[in-house]
């Protein structure tokens, strides 16, 4: 049958079906809407039967025609097949004209005809496509689709046609082939899919063709491919023998039907690049180079970058010689980064052209500053997480063409999250609604919901975080939440385009901050640093001789006003907190006592005329705060002699505790916890002798406990010993001996170790201090002799007990050797004894003389053998100790002899020079014993009267101008074995009984009570030695160390360097650097 006959036959069939359709529509109008839907089904069945009859007739008539090709050709679909027979133009034209005429006729009744046209015109459309007449095809489709849409035709002109309904027809169902995941060799996914296609083609016409339908290898999936098939056995048959699929032959997983559409879903990731943001190159000679975005072409998927060029000048130079040129080309060498130098290129023979603001060389554009501007594909750059280093920025340019620093920080990677909070005022900085202001209502990840402040916009709007920026106005009170000034608060005084100027509440400085680092707040900054260790206005120590006050807190540094009036910037780790000086006293220009929190006026110096409150006193310097001063937050420093107490006053409580009306300037002497006050008052017969000192009118403290040495019995500082600096009814401030740290402790956790007040106050064992100047040692009360009231031992006529030895033993020896009123020999406590829980005090007893006498006798005279003394050479012996320890050692200050004992008398100014007689250095032994016997004259020496009413005092009384430096090496309790710990190296002292072991070094293996199991290296054996016979080995530089005392006890680290008696240790736990005394460190055994 010819094509014309086919077309005529189809037309007749169409007319018949159209007439049937009209009759069916008349019937439909009579029925209800539900009934009409059911009626369409039999109609469709009749049409299908007619089509089948038509197909069978066509097959019978066309038996001689070659068989048709299958419509679904596997992997490749032919777009157009050319028929073997020649097609006549007139036949196509007739058919086309009939179609066009028919469409014009049926335009009025298109609702009834379009469905039938679609079904009947399928074959005719194939014939239309065979001829390439574009004009008539275009006219045909214009007329067909310009008047009405498919939705209007099918659904009666409804505009509510949803895309979801149309898409449901394309979704896979249970009757469709399934997708199976097959594990593949990574990187070979595409090649494996192609090899499966070739295998499918090869087996297509065999007895066992492959039963799979398709193979999918998505670009973003690594290590897997998807195979479409009805059964898993079909997949196994297809992948058998494919080398890249060996891993997945035994296990294939079926993709759920709901997830099958996601496999082929293409999500194009669009990089949101802005000009002046930073990227890096992925490949080529510019791999990993930093570049700046010049502009982006999203339509062409390209990006223009500004970068530092890499030009091979050697290659240009080698062009002169072809031989060298070919030799150079064999060895590829990545040229270094260097700015474009036009003069050098020309000197090497290169051709440089000019094009406006750019130079052209080898097809590349260079700026006049030497940067390369080149376009790359978007896939050739890395856009996420790009952070230019400081060196790269310096090489790129100091300030690259007005670069916006805010853009740099924004493009430093996705790890920087926004800091928007509900309640923030924001404005839109990008898009169509730019400059629209609003208030944040909610934050959901990167989506910010705001309520716009606009009269025409009443609904909430949602924006991405990058399109918003914080908005502030003048007068807002804000807090800095990030950056250098984090934690500071202040008032906004000026708002500029990219930053905000605010006036700090704390330091009264102007701060320049980015808007994104601010947040509205109502509270004021606490003035405490991030670590909570320091606060604004705190007195800190910069070095052993310099202190200062923190006037500005920053994230990593402090600004400190030192005692000389200079503001220095230091790191947090470089300062240490100064101990509390609230009770320090100084003298102003009119000899008034001034204290902390007093209001004073400055009458001299650079700050003359100012008035302020004293915050800190240190030596002769006072740190003052003035609310009228803006600089340094109102803090300034001046000398105390430049001050005068506001309103003036007489010396406070001076007559109660000073001699002759003298007001001491030293804060330590005037301190109520000092033993001199109690001793002096007791010595003068006041009823409060030894009661704890004077009071300055600040009666909130418990004076009974202040100054005592106590041991902490509970808590984290259990076992530590210190001196009570201040006390109330419930708590006490204790300065620890081991760490020089002052802490607050509950009084119920304290036990008194000893009393340091001379003046008759009894302690636990009836001893006042211990040795030295104690009145009673054993027994209780105030029994001056040793046993009861027996001054002579046997009868009442013998004043000296044995011979001329009045103070033979410790009991009746008020001082050690010289008189009780000898101002030249205060005889401080000599040493601690293990049978009494008494550690040496926090402060040594002051000397009654400034120059000439004993300026500071050592508090512990002899170091106890059980104490780990690292530097014993710094322990001068206490005067007067020879008689106490039955030795023949001498002291040039207190060793009177019968031949010529010298007893100094204080001059009116008490600035005399001690000059002992030459004979005073000889020790004459008593017939009764081998004890040095002091001359009787020593106990009868009377000092000359002083014009200022000065008289000799109890040892330890204050003296004008006397000073009390701390004794070196007295920071560790002598009878303590707390330093003993495992794994440290020790040395056996000469006090150990076994002489073969003495002097050997070893390592402590274990500690039980006071006994240590020590492995001796030399003798290669383990011995048990008491801790009192051991001493730790001092570590040296780069040694592994272990902290043996203090709050960091048991911590390990590496000793990096040594500065005097201190060592800088890098701790193993937190990698922090700490400065510790070498006596607190033990040397670990090297691995």
Swiss-Prot record:
Changing residue 806 to A: Decreased ability to promote transcription elongation. The lineage of its organism: Eukaryota, Metazoa, Chordata, Craniata, Vertebrata. GO terms for biological process: negative regulation of DNA-templated transcription, elongation; negative regulation of transcription by RNA polymerase II; positive regulation of DNA-templated transcription, elongation; positive regulation of macroautophagy; positive regulation of transcription by RNA polymerase II; positive regulation of transcription elongation by RNA polymerase II; regulation of transcription elongation by RNA polymerase II; transcription elongation by RNA polymerase II. Disulfide bonds: none annotated. The modification Symmetric dimethylarginine is found at residue 698. This is Transcription elongation factor SPT5. GO terms for molecular function: chromatin binding; enzyme binding; mRNA binding; protein heterodimerization activity; RNA binding. Residues 1-92, 670-700, 747-978 are annotated as: Disordered. DNA binds at residue 619. The modification Phosphoserine is found at residues 32, 36, 666, 686, 789, 804.
């Amino acid at each position: 049958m010819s094509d014309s006959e086919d077309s005529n036959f189809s037309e007749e069939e169409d007319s018949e079906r159209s007439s049937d359709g009209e009759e069916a529509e008349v019937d439909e109008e009579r029925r209800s809407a539900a009934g009409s839907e059911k009626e369409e089904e039999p109609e469709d069945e009749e049409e299908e039967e007619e089509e089948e009859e038509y197909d069978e007739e066509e097959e019978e008539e066309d038996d001689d025609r070659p068989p048709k090709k299958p419509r679904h050709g596997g992997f490749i679909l032919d777009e157009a097949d050319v028929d073997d027979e020649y097609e006549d133009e007139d036949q196509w034209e007739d058919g086309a004209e009939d179609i066009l005429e028919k469409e014009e006729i049926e335009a009025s009744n298109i609702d009834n005809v379009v469905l039938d046209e679609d079904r009947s015109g399928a074959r005719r459309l194939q014939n239309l496509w065979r001829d390439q007449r574009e004009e008539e095809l275009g006219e045909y489709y214009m007329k067909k689709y310009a008047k009405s849409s498919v939705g209007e035709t099918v659904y009666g002109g409804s505009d509510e046609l949803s895309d979801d309904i149309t898409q449901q027809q394309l979704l896979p169902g249970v009757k469709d082939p399934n997708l199976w995941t097959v594990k593949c060799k990574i990187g070979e996914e595409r090649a494996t899919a192609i090899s499966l296609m070739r295998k499918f083609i090869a087996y297509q016409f065999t007895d066992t063709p492959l039963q799979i339908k398709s193979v999918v290898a998505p670009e973003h999936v690594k290590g897997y491919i998807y195979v479409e098939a009805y059964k898993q056995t079909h997949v196994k048959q297809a992948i058998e023998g494919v080398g890249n699929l060996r891993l997945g032959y035994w296990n294939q997983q079926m993709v759920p039907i709901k997830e099958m559409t996601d496999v082929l879903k293409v999500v194009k990731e669009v990089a949101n690049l802005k000009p002046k943001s930073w990227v890096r190159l992925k490949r080529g000679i510019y791999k990993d180079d930093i570049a700046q975005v010049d502009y982006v072409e999203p339509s062409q998927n390209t990006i223009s970058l500004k970068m530092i060029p890499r030009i091979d000048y050697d290659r240009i130079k080698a062009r002169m010689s072809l031989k060298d040129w070919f030799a150079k080309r064999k060895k590829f060498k990545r040229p270094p980064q260097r700015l474009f130098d036009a003069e050098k290129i020309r000197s090497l023979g290169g051709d440089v052209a000019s094009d406006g603001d750019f130079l052209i060389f080898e097809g590349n554009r260079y700026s006049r500053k030497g940067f390369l501007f080149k376009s790359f594909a978007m896939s050739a750059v890395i856009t996420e997480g790009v952070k230019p280093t400081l060196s790269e920025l310096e090489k790129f340019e100091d300030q690259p063409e007005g670069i916006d620093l805010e853009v740099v920080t924004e493009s430093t990677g996705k790890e920087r999250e926004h800091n928007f909070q509900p309640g923030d005022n924001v404005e839109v900085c990008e898009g169509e609604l730019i400059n629209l202001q609003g208030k944040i209502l909610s934050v959901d990840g990167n989506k910010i919901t705001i309520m716009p402040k606009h009269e025409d916009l009443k609904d909430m709007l949602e924006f991405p975080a990058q399109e918003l920026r914080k908005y502030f106005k003048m007068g807002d009170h804000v807090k800095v939440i990030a950056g250098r000034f984090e934690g500071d608060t202040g008032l906004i005084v000026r708002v500029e385009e990219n930053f905000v100027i605010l006036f700090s509440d704390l330091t009264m400085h102007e701060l320049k901050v980015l808007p994104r680092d601010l947040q509205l707040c109502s509270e004021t900054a606490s003035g405490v640093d991030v670590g909570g260790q320091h606060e604004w206005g705190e007195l800190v120590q910069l070095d052993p001789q310099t202190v200062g006050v923190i006037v500005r807190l920053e994230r990593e540094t402090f600004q400190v006003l030192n005692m000389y009036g200079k503001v220095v910037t230091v790191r947090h780790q470089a300062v240490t907190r100064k101990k509390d000086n609230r009770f320090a006293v100084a003298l102003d220009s009119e000899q008034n006592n001034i204290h902390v929190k007093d209001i004073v006026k400055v009458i001299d110096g650079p700050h003359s005329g100012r008035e302020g409150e004293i915050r800190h006193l240190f030596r002769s310097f006072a740190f003052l705060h003035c609310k009228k001063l803006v600089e340094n937050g109102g803090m300034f420093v001046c000398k105390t002699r430049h001050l005068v107490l506001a309103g003036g006053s007489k010396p406070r409580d001076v007559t109660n505790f000073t001699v002759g009306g003298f007001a001491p300037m030293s804060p330590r002497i005037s301190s109520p916890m000092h033993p001199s006050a109690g001793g002096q008052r007791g010595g003068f017969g006041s009823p409060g002798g030894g009661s704890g000192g004077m009071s300055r009118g600040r009666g909130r403290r418990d004076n009974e406990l202040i100054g005592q040495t106590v041991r902490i019995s509970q808590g984290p500082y259990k076992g530590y010993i210190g001196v009570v600096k201040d006390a109330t009814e419930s708590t006490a401030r204790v300065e620890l001996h081991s760490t020089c740290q002052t802490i607050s402790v509950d009084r119920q956790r304290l036990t008194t170790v000893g009393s340091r007040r001379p003046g008759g106050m009894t302690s636990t064992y009836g001893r006042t201090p211990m040795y030295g100047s104690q009145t009673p040692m054993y027994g209780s009360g105030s029994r001056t002799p040793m046993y009861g009231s027996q001054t002579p031992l046997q009868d009442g006529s013998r004043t000296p007990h044995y011979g001329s030895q009045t103070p033979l033993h410790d009991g009746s020896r008020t001082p050690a050797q010289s008189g009780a009123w000898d101002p030249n020999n205060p005889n401080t406590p000599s040493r601690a004894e293990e049978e009494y829980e008494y550690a040496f005090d926090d402060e040594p007893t002051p000397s009654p003389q400034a120059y000439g006498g004993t300026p500071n006798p050592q508090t512990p005279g002899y170091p106890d053998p059980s104490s780990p003394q690292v530097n014993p050479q710094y322990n001068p012996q206490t005067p007067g100790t020879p008689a106490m320890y039955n030795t023949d050692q001498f002291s040039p200050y207190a060793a009177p002899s019968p031949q010529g004992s010298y007893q100094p008398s204080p001059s009116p100014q008490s600035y005399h020079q001690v000059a002992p007689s030459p004979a005073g250095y000889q020790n004459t032994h008593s017939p009764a014993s081998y004890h040095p016997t002091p001359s009787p004259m020593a106990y009868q020496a009377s000092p000359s009267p002083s014009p200022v009413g000065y008289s000799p005092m109890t040892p330890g009384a204050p003296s004008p101008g006397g000073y009390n430096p701390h004794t070196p090496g007295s920071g560790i309790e002598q009878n303590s074995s707390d330093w003993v710990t495992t794994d440290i190296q020790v040395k056996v002292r000469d006090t150990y009984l076994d002489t073969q072991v003495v002097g050997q070094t070893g390592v402590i293996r274990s500690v039980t009570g006071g006994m240590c199991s020590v492995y001796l290296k030399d003798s290669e054996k383990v011995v048990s030695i008491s801790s009192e016979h051991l001493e730790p080995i001092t570590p040296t530089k780069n040694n592994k160390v272990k902290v043996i005392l203090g709050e960091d006890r048991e911590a390990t680290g590496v000793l990096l360097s040594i500065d005097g008696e201190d060592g800088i240790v890098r701790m193993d736990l937190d990698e922090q650097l700490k400065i510790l005394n070498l006596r607190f460190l033990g040397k670990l055994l090297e691995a």
